[in-house]
Curated annotation (Swiss-Prot):
Residue(s) carrying Phosphoserine: S96
Function noted in UniProt: Catalyzes the reversible conversion of ribose-5-phosphate to ribulose 5-phosphate.
PANTHER family: RIBOSE-5-PHOSPHATE ISOMERASE 2-RELATED (PTHR43748:SF2), RIBOSE-5-PHOSPHATE ISOMERASE 3, CHLOROPLASTIC-RELATED (PTHR43748)
Major subcellular site: cytoplasm
GO molecular function terms listed in the Swiss-Prot or TrEMBL record: ribose-5-phosphate isomerase activity
Gene Ontology cellular-component annotations: cytoplasm
Entry-annotated residues carrying N-acetylalanine: A2
Keywords assigned by UniProt, alphabetized: Acetylation, Cytoplasm, Isomerase, Phosphoprotein
InterPro entries associated with the record: NagB/RpiA_transferase-like, Ribose-5P_isomerase, Ribose5P_isomerase_typA_subgr, Ribose5P_isomerase_type_A
Deletion phenotype: Retarded growth and slight chlorosis due to decreased chloroplast photosynthetic capacity. Reduced accumulation of starch in leaves. Late flowering when grown under short-day conditions.
Entry protein name: Probable ribose-5-phosphate isomerase 2
Name of the gene encoding the protein in the UniProt record: RPI2
Family: Belongs to the ribose 5-phosphate isomerase family.
């Protein structure tokens, strides 16, 4: 069932002191994390218009957005939508909902992508890919005119790596230990640990592209993220990393006090 949210609780980054459009302080809505994710996702789908080519994200938050798009198509409120899925899982979901699908070869420019994130810093830089789909996500969202990110407020951090959770790096399987050690050594100054991601039965997790993922855990602020990004990508064996720098157009943040919208300036 669709969740309602009070428009008085929606703010923009013109005033980041939060929820100052309400005449009195809003009361906490006491919602679960999944309900907050759904609220953010439904708000993001308001950006969708008939005739658009859409990048369809992957993960627990993006799933709600894909569900909503399918619902609006069934209701006839959206028409002539084409979806570009960022993973096999999202592809299966979209097909089950009757969303027409295509790919970047047929649609190299995407009107709008909607996806979740694992971290969002004050400059709207992101960590993504803890679900394992970072390469396709970055290809599709990087080809988008507008990229809307949907999160609950637990994903907001002071700096990338601030959650102490993983920064994923996709690598080729060949001599993965060699590549993982190079990554660890590269970020050693930030207190880095590098661990191969494991999947079922303790075997290496394999991405949709047939690659492995090394999860990087850093203890300190990495500072110049652009320089760190370049250094990671220069390592032979690295395919892509999960830092999405200067890519988000808008971030929609759902919390117990309502929904907040931040736009890239």
């Amino acid at each position: 069932m669709a969740l309602a949210y009070d428009p008085l609780f929606i703010t923009s980054d013109k005033s980041l002191s939060a929820f100052d459009v309400a005449s009195s302080p809003p009361q906490p809505m006491n919602l679960t994390q999944d309900e907050l994710k759904r609220i953010a996702a439904y708000k993001a789908v308001e950006f969708v218009e008939s005739g658009m080519v859409l990048g369809l994200g992957t993960g627990s938050t993006a799933k709600h957005a894909v569900d909503r798009i399918g619902e609006l198509l069934r209701q006839g409120k959206l028409e002539n939508i084409v979806g570009i899925p960022t993973s096999k899982k999202t592809q299966e979901q979209a097909l089950s909902l009757g969303i027409p699908l295509s790919d970047l070869d047929a649609h190299p420019v995407i009107d709008l992508s909607i996806d979740g994130a694992d971290e969002v810093d004050p400059f709207l830089n992101l960590v993504k890919g803890r679900g394992g789909s970072l390469l396709r996500e970055k290809m599709i969202e990087g080809a988008s005119k507008k990229f809307v990110v949907i999160v609950d407020d637990s994903k907001m951090v002071k700096h990338i790596g601030g959650s102490k959770l993983a920064l994923p790096v996709e690598i080729v399987p060949f001599c993965w230990k060699f590549t993982a050690e190079k990554l660890r050594s590269l970020l050693e100054g930030y207190g880095c640990e590098a661990n191969l991601r494991l999947g079922e039965k303790g075997k290496a997790f394999v991405t949709d592209n047939g690659n492995y993922i090394v999860d990087m855990h850093v203890e300190e602020d990495m500072g110049d993220l652009g320089a760190v990004s370049d250094a990671i990508l220069r390592l032979p064996g690295v395919v892509e990393h999960g830092m999405f720098l200067d890519m988000a157009s808008t971030v929609i943040i759902a919390g117990e006090l309502g929904v907040k919208i931040k736009n890239k300036h």
